[in-house]
UniProtKB/Swiss-Prot annotation:
Reaction(s) catalysed by this chain's protein: RNA(n+1) + phosphate = RNA(n) + a ribonucleoside 5'-diphosphate
Disulphide-bonded residues: none
SMART domains for the chain: KH, S1
The protein's required cofactors: Mg(2+)
Stated name of the protein: Polyribonucleotide nucleotidyltransferase
Keywords (A to Z) from UniProt: Cytoplasm, Magnesium, Metal-binding, Nucleotidyltransferase, RNA-binding, Transferase
Primary location: cytoplasm
S1 motif domain boundaries: 621-689
Native organism: Shewanella sp. (strain W3-18-1)
Amino acid sequence: MNPIVKSFEYGQHTVTLETGVIARQADAAVLASMGDTTVLVTVVGKKEAEAGRDFFPLTVNYQEKTYAAGKIPGGFFKREGRPSEDETLIARLIDRPIRPLFPNGFKNEVQVIITVVSVDPQIEPDIISMIGTSAALAISGIPFSGPLGAARVGYINGEYVLNPTVAQIETSQLNLVVAGTASAVLMVESEAQALPEEVMLGSVVYGHDQQQVVINAIAEFKAEAGKPMWDWTAPVQDETLVAQIKELAEAGLGDAYKIQVKQDRYAQVAVVKAATKEALLASNPNIDLREVDNLLGSLEKKVVRGRIIRGEPRIDGREPDMIRALSVLAGVLPRTHGSALFTRGETQALVTCTLGTERDAQKIDSIMGERTNRFMLHYNFPPYSVGETGMVGSPKRREIGHGKLAWRGINAVMPSAEEFPYSVRVVSEITESNGSSSMASVCGTSLALMDAGVPIKTSVAGIAMGLVKEGDDFVVLSDILGDEDHLGDMDFKVAGTRGGITALQMDIKIEGITKEIMEIALQQAYGARVHILNVMDQAIGSHRDDISDHAPRITTIKINPEKIRDVIGKGGAVIRALTEETGTTIELEDDGTVRIASSNGEATKEAIRRIEEITSEVEVGRIYNGKVIRIVDFGAFVNILPGKDGLVHISQISDERVANVSDHLELNQEVAVKVMEVDRQGRVRLSIKEAQTKEAAAE
């Protein structure tokens, strides 16, 4: 075994790429490390494509092994199970920038597997996974227009920080990941604290500039370790068939794309394509219909893009910077804690908000450590939203990714636990879709949170931008349709407030996207965002003054931390009885904070009363009404407060001589007792006769 190793400094860390020792039967295998965080990236591709395949079957699997953090998995089987949400999101993060770097017409199956084998809790594994993937593809011999670089950018005290640690991210106003080639940015994923457009754009440029060291290092690594390039050539188009299809379908497709209603437009496009195939089959019964479909798709793309570049109206008749008609409704469902229906053209989201206690927060145990999410956002995309049938079940990768993007857009304006001690779950049901349903989810979430009485800092809106570029000519499109997303060169989603950007996601399919184009897109997105916010504010401009009657009301009280064990009781008996008998949810913190949650105000008051009884101190000289709980030869034990018992000595039962305690007292008898003493060990001495004397004197 002859390892080939390449090391370089990258920000605060040393990056090492190694090949030639592990997984040598894969087309390429790279052990990539950044500090103590190490991933094994393998690439395998099939030399031949399946006959008739009309898509590129790229699979990216990212898996975190618990042994990487020195942990044993939980559960019965004690092994890793299905991918977590974090694993799914990182797999998508890697997939998005590498996919456009494979050549057009390449249909061979390629599988990339990234395995996290060691992790430093201060260095997240996503950036080194992207770097390792780029290096493995570069040396594999598979056709790939890399290398690709990747960087995380933070913004702390007005300065950009390259690849900040986990601790630094906690104080950063920005968490941005950017990936690209030497000449072009291909992908951006970010979360920000309402930063201005110029700061966000600057972070993208900074990250792309800094990652050139990665690109250069991988190029050197490839020169030393790269395998021979595959003998693959792109399929040659049948120009005669291209001309025939253009003659038969161009005019019809042009007319079809003037129909503004999506379903009607799709129906007419299908008619044009069917007529074209019929005409071609009549002249050549052996024609390859898959090739015809591909060429019709290319012609469709040229027709739509050409109209936009020439300055003609868009598919639905809008100008480039126009937003579709908006409909905004808050409080649309009677029993939910908060709800909203947000409609933009043919895209619609029904969003609900549910409030819960700290116990309802999401507990996550990953290789990076344990964390708790008080704010959850789940995005569902049922098949009926696009007029189709399909499987309904657990969320797919796309749904998880869109939900996380919407979460990032909203998280910056969420209140702290001190301001609002509730767990919050938002669900966005996409009921109609024709472009940018994730941004509709952002708008709907902002509205539903306000309807639920969640004191978010301000309203948030999101917009999806697109781009059509031919040579030096380009047009930036606001509020893109699904077709414009599919046929365009860029998908650029921006969420934010009037004050700045909270989330930015960008996927670019071509090179040549300049800083100036991104600047225009951001400014155009700002105008669109403000327009949407103005409409949203007309429906609900600020959060409700109170939460829903159907939501649990959380009341917070403070007790002496030393009394926590008294409230819990032996084996949890006291707190269990409290919650069952009052119907409330009670949560305790180590500092003595007690949160009581219930939708019934009287139940909350009763729980507070009983907790105060349990935690109150026994006062010497005070008379209590207690209950006899045990009788012994030398006296009786009386319970005066929950968890507080005292001894009435036989000499303190009566002024008369008592020979037998049972002659004067019985179990469960209620008696008035006076506290005579509490000794250093907390033992309480009680007197019945002193209580009677005091009561008689009071009369």
